[in-house]
Amino acid sequence: MNLINMDSENRVVLNVGGIRHETYKATLKKIPATRLSRLTEALANYDPILNEYFFDRHPGVFAQVLNYYRTGKLHYPTDVCGPLFEEELEFWGLDSNQVEPCCWMTYTQHRDTQETLAVLDRLDLDTEKPSEEELARKFGFEEDYYKGTISWWQEMKPRIWSLFDEPYSSNAAKTIGVVSVFFICISILSFCLKTHPDMRVPIVRNITVKTANGSNGWFLDKTQTNAHIAFFYIECVCNAWFTFEILVRFISSPNKWEFIKSSVNIIDYIATLSFYIDLVLQRFASHLENADILEFFSIIRIMRLFKLTRHSSGLKILIQTFRASAKELTLLVFFLVLGIVIFASLVYYAERIQPNPHNDFNSIPLGLWWALVTMTTVGYGDMAPKTYIGMFVGALCALAGVLTIALPVPVIVSNFAMYYSHTQARAKLPKKRRRVLPVEQPRQPRLPGAPGGVSGCGTPGSGPHSGPMGSGGTGPRRMNNKTKDLVSPKSDMAFSFD
């Protein structure tokens, strides 16, 4: 009988979320410096009538926590979200790094998801119009917004920025976005068409004919041509729009430094400046022998296609996919270069072993071109091995190229699918959510016969009907600052439980 009493005294009952768990006190002492290892009957959550400790926490996670005390192994429940699991472990005083290796990959998936969502937030893919408070915070005049002292420029600056940088914010912004895309397409089309022979005009040169009378003449030089004058006017109109767009976006940008160092904006600067540089240098082109070299700078304007990323979320995701796959792409290039050098050297010496009057591989640098074309499975056919040993090397080169390129591709595709799926799910998620107020501590019950507003602890003003000054609830309640901020016209749903 004494053994039974001793066993019952060593047992402890834990009621977590309405589910009762029973274990030994010695089990809870296995992991010191935790919440369960310091249980005493003096705690507020101890019920002397039921002889149990009550915790209003997640019961499913606590089952794994209690098993950790019993077995010394912490496993991750698959039906619980990662942040909730971390929050519960923090409440019980446990380290999340003690999760077993078998559950570690599943447990850390939420961290990858959080990083992905953070990246998507930086990409600015939202099509929903932000609130006035969010705009004030973004443009740095939040204090003036709360004080109600917003100037005319502070009010117009977000609107101008939305018109030129957020194409889906309003109908006017969509119109400006269409105009911007139109000028980009016209500029690229003009850049391509002006190189067509039918779109070029032969150069007319004046020469001096030395005759007895001394007359001047001219002739038509068909070997050298210039683009039609219409393309010059088209480029002037397009670059005038691009210059206006850059200036307006820079003036109205919320962060000037972030705007300057943006990769898309840098491309826009270079492409626009190249037009003006070309315009200045054309004045001196007639004095240069190779004036065509100046036209090389105009190739920078083709990079304006990257400006379309502002108007397409798919292009933003694609570029972010390549950024996230930088390690895999670097590894791919490394193995390609390694294979190209190896097989170029092998095919050079393989073709020299046997007599071959039609040897195309006169040097290893020529073999580098052949190895690159073969490993990428392009195969132009301009160079090909003629000997059996060279053919064997070519077969190995093609096989190695297929394996080298095919291995990193699934990783890149997986990254794109991950970003795209998160973007689609994020688009369906409502941006404005119902705010949940923090749960207040329950008030102590009022003792029988005690005056109104005096609780069992003898504290005035804590009764169920107490007013702001401890009276019987006759005066109006005072709203604290936190509740006052929540109950505002801008919040979707907020209640006060004072």
From Swiss-Prot:
This is Potassium voltage-gated channel protein Shaw. Disulfide bonds: none annotated. Heterotetramer of potassium channel proteins. GO terms for molecular function: delayed rectifier potassium channel activity; voltage-gated monoatomic cation channel activity; voltage-gated potassium channel activity. It is found in: Membrane. It is a multi-pass membrane protein. The keyword rRNA processing does not apply. Residues 431-498 are annotated as: Disordered. The chain crosses the membrane at residues 175-193, 230-252, 263-284, 292-313, 329-350, 392-413. Belongs to the potassium channel family. C (Shaw) (TC 1.A.1.2) subfamily. Shaw sub-subfamily. Mediates the voltage-dependent potassium ion permeability of excitable membranes. Assuming opened or closed conformations in response to the voltage difference across the membrane, the protein forms a potassium-selective channel through which potassium ions may pass in accordance with their electrochemical gradient. It comes from the Eukaryota. Keywords: Glycoprotein, Ion channel, Ion transport, Membrane, Potassium, Potassium channel, Potassium transport, Transmembrane, Transmembrane helix, Transport, Voltage-gated channel. GO terms for cellular component: axon terminus; dendrite membrane; neuronal cell body membrane; plasma membrane; postsynaptic membrane; presynaptic membrane; voltage-gated potassium channel complex. A motif (Selectivity filter) lies at residues 377-382. It comes from Drosophila melanogaster. InterPro entries: BTB/POZ_dom, Ion_trans_dom, K_chnl_volt-dep_Kv, K_chnl_volt-dep_Kv3, SKP1/BTB/POZ_sf, T1-type_BTB, VG_K_chnl, Volt_channel_dom_sf. The segment S4 is probably the voltage-sensor and is characterized by a series of positively charged amino acids at every third position. Its main location: membrane. Residues 450-461 have a biased composition (Gly residues). Glycans are attached at residues 206, 213, 481. GO terms for biological process: action potential; potassium ion transmembrane transport; potassium ion transport; protein homooligomerization; sleep.
